[in-house]
Amino acid sequence: MRETAPGAVRMMANRLLDTNLRQGTDRAIGAHYSYLCPSPHVYKWQRFWDSCFQAIAIAHIDPEQAKSELRTLLAAQDDDGFIGHITFWGAKLRGLPHPSAYGQSRPGERLTHSALIQPPMLAQAVERVAEIAHDPAFAPPLMAALDSYHNWLAENRAPDADGLLVIVSPYESGADQSPTFDEAMGIRGRAGRWRLGFKDRWLDLRNWLNDYDPTKMLGAGHFHVKDSTVNALYADSLATMARLHRRQGNDQSAAAYVGLASHVTDSMLIKMLDRSDAIFRSLIGREERRSEPLTVLGLVPLILEGIPREVAAEIAERQLRSHDHFSLRYPVPSVAASEPSFDPRGTGLIWRGPTWVNTNWLLWRGLQRHGEAELAGQLADATVAMVAQAGLREFYNPHSGQGLGAESFGWSALALDMAESS
């Protein structure tokens, strides 16, 4: 009997438990860890939003490991609530991190975690894993840590009255080399790998010289971006926290989160929504110049329940259904096909054309929330077929579906959640 695409993806996800699982006790951090590395050959440390996505995927295979993944992420949390975008579990045993990691960590934290954030996906992962595992008791013990994390974000990365988070490095967006950030990085014209790499390391050095202190970095403004994806997931995370608190009878906390989520969403609609092109645009610099390239980062705000239905419908029609922009054979490309920077093979630089499963999953969720069931189903089917055909790869050619980048890539197993839930 021929194996179905969902069945093939399930088998691939199951193999991650053999190839990507890392367990042990870290004496530097003082905690036990059990997580899936994003890719055993390329990315061996725990990464923030990778773990959030991987937990959702693996919950369909091993719910207990999915819970351990998220508990491990929280085990490295600082006392003030901060969680770094990379945690170097077992570094003394596995060897030192890549040299670039030193430039993204404070002195004294080099064998524990980085000093950068990633898009807030933790609350959503906790909620989804609890749903898949049918375990309402999973979230309550984590709420204090989740509250502390969200408090840190609001107090340290939202300096203005609009409530929007500011990122201080393109790595904090999770889409490191997206052309969305070329202007903020001082890139004019074509961005080469070595040129952008030098700019990245130079920015790391400047942030390191500011001790990765949020006040100093925001004051210096070397990289000051209110990113559309980071803030969409922030607002979505706040709304998720409201639901989690409400389920536990914490109505006052729930109301506070609802208010903040609404405020951030309203600010995005006012400042970021480009109605002429039906896309959200990141804000560059203190002047809040709108980013110009059409990228998937401007579509992720579809995840927000608070955006008007007509706005969501316009984005779906003019962007996701457009063959000139994002409706390719294996959607959704990270950059619109109409953009000069579009590279479907990801040659040299990533996030400049290939399709990524994590953003597909976010868009699929957003389309479902806004009544675009047919388009959501088409996206799920294409994503599952792509992964079944090419395997768990880091990203994919949107024309051919060819798998590219790292192999045994954990978050691409999100296709399983799309298959199981569609």
Q: What is the role of each PLM region?
A:
Residues 51, 119, 123-126, 231, ...:
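TPR repeat positional signature
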Residues 2-45, 70-112, 162-226, 263-355, ...:
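Extended glycan-interaction surfaces of carbohydrate-active proteins
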Residues 123, 130, 235, 239-242, ...:
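Heptad-repeat amphipathic alpha-helical coiled-coil interaction surface used
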Residues 51-81, 297-308, 360-373:
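Alpha-helical support elements that line or immediately flank enzyme active sites
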Residues 118-175:
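Internal, well-ordered domain-core segments that constitute the primary functional module
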Residues 105-117, 121-132, 362-366:
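Hydrophobic/aromatic-rich effector regions of fungal transcription factors
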